[in-house]
């Protein structure tokens, strides 16, 4: 494997373990020329799942495309790379486990939004604004209105008592 920093092939595996999804082996490697470390993943090559776009085009399911969109939505939020990877792993696992050869881009987007909704409201709204193609502030307001009732329910005390007696 070529070192992504210096391009040399001379490296060794420092650590090897199953990824959280258990569908890949995560390897930490050290380049013996520049001494820098990098991570690689080894996984079984699957038959491709095709994503049917809104305009009818088909393209192969692309984990990196989903990862990129989620990373943008989670920028400057208190969300770890591991949490982002878990979301992507969950999306990928759900579609692979379904054993479908094709899946609509709408189903993919909705699944990502569902998982982001549970993780972080701001990341969810950011992702939704791109995915649902918000045109103006009114679109944001409508989405935020749907979040307010949920937030109120989450903030209520478990015993149902209020502070005023």
Curated annotation (Swiss-Prot):
Necessary cofactors: Zn(2+)
Top-rank taxon: Bacteria
Positions of disulphide bridges: none
Co-factor binding details: Binds 1 zinc ion.
InterPro entries: ATP-cone_dom, NrdR-like_N, RNR_NrdR-like
Residue spans, zinc finger unnamed: 3-34
GO biological process: negative regulation of DNA-templated transcription
Record-annotated ATP-cone domain positions: 49-139
Function: Negatively regulates transcription of bacterial ribonucleotide reductase nrd genes and operons by binding to NrdR-boxes.
Protein name, per record: Transcriptional repressor NrdR
Organism, as annotated: Desulforapulum autotrophicum (strain ATCC 43914 / DSM 3382 / VKM B-1955 / HRM2)
Gene name as annotated: nrdR
């Amino acid at each position: 494997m070529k070192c992504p920093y210096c391009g040399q092939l001379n490296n060794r595996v420092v650590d090897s373990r199953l990824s959280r999804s258990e569908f890949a082996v995560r390897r930490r490697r050290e380049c013996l020329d520049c001494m820098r470390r990098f991570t690689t993943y080894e996984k079984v090559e699957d038959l491709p799942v095709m994503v049917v776009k809104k305009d009818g085009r088909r393209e192969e399911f692309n984990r990196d495309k989903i990862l990129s969109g989620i990373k943008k939505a989670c920028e400057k939020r208190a969300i770890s790379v591991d949490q982002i990877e878990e979301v992507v792993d969950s999306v990928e696992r759900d579609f692979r486990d379904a054993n479908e050869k094709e899946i609509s881009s709408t189903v993919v987007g909705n699944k990502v939004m569902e998982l982001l909704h549970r993780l972080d409201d701001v990341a969810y709204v950011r992702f939704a604004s791109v995915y649902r193609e918000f045109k103006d502030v009114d679109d944001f307001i409508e989405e935020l209105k749907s979040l307010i009732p949920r937030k109120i329910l989450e903030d209520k005390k478990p015993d149902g008592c209020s502070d005023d007696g």
